[in-house]
Amino acid sequence: MIEINNNHNNGNGKQFPSSQIMPDSKKKSIVKIGEYTLGEKIGRGAFGQVFKGLNGKTGEFVAIKQIDSNKIDESSLQSVKGEVEILHKLRHNNIVKVLGVVEVQAQLNFILEYVENGSLRDVIEKFGPLSEELCIIYLYQMLQGLAYLHSNKVIHRDIKASNILITKEGVIKLADFGVASQIDSESQLRFSVVGTPYWMAPESIEISGCSSASDIWSLGSTMIELLTGNPPYYTLQPMAAMFRIVSDQHPPFPTDISKEFLDYFQQSFKKDPTQRPTAQELLQHPIFFTLQKVPPTLSELQSTLKTLNGGRSRLRTSVNSIDWGSSSSTSGSSTPLSSSSSSSNIKSIVSDEDFNKLQTTIKQQAQTISNLSEEILILKKELKEKPKLEEQQFYKEYFMALAISVKVNQCYQDKTCEPKDMQQLYEMARSQEIPWYKLIEWIPSQLISNDNIPQLTPSSSRENISLSNSSSSIPNPNQNQNQNNKSKSKKFGFFS
């Protein structure tokens, strides 16, 4: 009988089962590009496919963007080469690095930094729309990358989720610079229609000049994409979407977003590109104040103390179990420890003094962090209340100016007072000798309308003030209209 052995020798005398051997049918042909081996396809760029690659010398994984120069026109080829020239000069943590270029016959192979988690478009397709908190974390990194680009006179011109990569640690990388341009100065504009319709700025569509401000608009559209799962106007055909981008005041904003995020969108989507903040300026936007969290190191320090005390107990037990009078040698004989200093040095490891010093230091650090945490919470509360205070002050100044204007006009017609009296009246109101909200009683009701009142949304927490119980030593020239004015003020609920 012939015995069949299904195990195979690996050349070192060791056997392994045949199930671990790759069949010839599954073996793929190895494609070498310089010192790199081409792997699986991982994506598609503006002008070609992207593959995973392995450096055969260093073991480093890379992304290899392949472009057949025979299949694209000369202008596109120049655009691709421009991408390499731009990226090769840039070194920033939030921008994909170009490691080199390998040209094989008519094929260009761009060796890029490999970003393992793919694009943010991949992320939202797998996990759905992102939370506002996570979007803010990503947005901050995108702005850092854009600020670096713009400081180097480079505009991306195609910012969107599919062109923004993310590492497994959550680090954002701007990528795909196939349509990027370098400008000599901030005032120089690029006059060509490039980009992807749903993310394009109005000035890019109208060919009125693309600048770094166009990237700010596109980034705003990208944030809408991350928050909702889709870019603005995604239900429309590209041409219709571009028409709406140009004709609308701004794209539709997502619902249920914070006041800070709403303000960020309002700043980013200003139709006049010269009025949009720069990436560097947006890094100071209040939306990022929410990233300041109370340090979690208090609990970490408590855990450290617990571990420290547990370690001390275990170490003391181990040391006490040692027979300090003898030690086992390699020959098996027992030899007394001749040096008493050895014993004392070992025991000093678990001395209470050393542990207590370390414990005291950690407790002091914990107290310092606790104090800082309280200060951070106070600052966050003040920042949260600041917009309300500013809004209240705005209304106050608005109605004071309107009331004084009406009063001056009334006095001018009746010749009942001098301009200096008006100045005194105004100063009294500013110094709060007269309740400023009383001035609303001087304003004829027809002046208090939706057309005249600033279009701001009053805070829901603001209490309405009944003017019927307030008093003033200043005579009211519109006494017969008081009731109407009171109802108007209560209706809008501006005061608190």
From Swiss-Prot:
Family membership noted in the UniProt record: Belongs to the protein kinase superfamily. STE Ser/Thr protein kinase family.
Domain Protein kinase residues, every copy: 36-288
InterPro entries reported for this sequence: Kinase-like_dom_sf, Prot_kinase_dom, Protein_kinase_ATP_BS, Ser-Thr/Tyr_kinase_cat_dom, Ser/Thr_kinase_AS, STE20/SPS1-PAK
Sites where the protein binds ATP: I42, G43, R44, G45, A46, F47, G48, Q49, V50, K65
Catalyzed reactions per annotation: L-seryl-[protein] + ATP = O-phospho-L-seryl-[protein] + ADP + H(+); L-threonyl-[protein] + ATP = O-phospho-L-threonyl-[protein] + ADP + H(+)
Enzyme Commission code: 2.7.11.1
Region (Disordered): 1-25, 323-345, 454-496
Protein name: Probable serine/threonine-protein kinase DDB_G0284251
Coiled coil: 353-386
Tree of life domain: Eukaryota
Active site: D158 (proton acceptor)
GO molecular function terms listed in the Swiss-Prot or TrEMBL record: ATP binding; metal ion binding; protein serine kinase activity; protein serine/threonine kinase activity
Cofactor dependency: Mg(2+)
Pfam families, per the entry: Pkinase
Naturally occurring in which organism (per UniProt): Dictyostelium discoideum
Record's keyword terms, sorted: ATP-binding, Coiled coil, Kinase, Magnesium, Metal-binding, Nucleotide-binding, Serine/threonine-protein kinase, Transferase
Family annotation (PROSITE patterns): PROTEIN_KINASE_ATP (PS00107), PROTEIN_KINASE_DOM (PS50011), PROTEIN_KINASE_ST (PS00108)
Cellular-component GO terms for this entry: cytoplasm
Biased composition (Low complexity): 1-13, 458-486
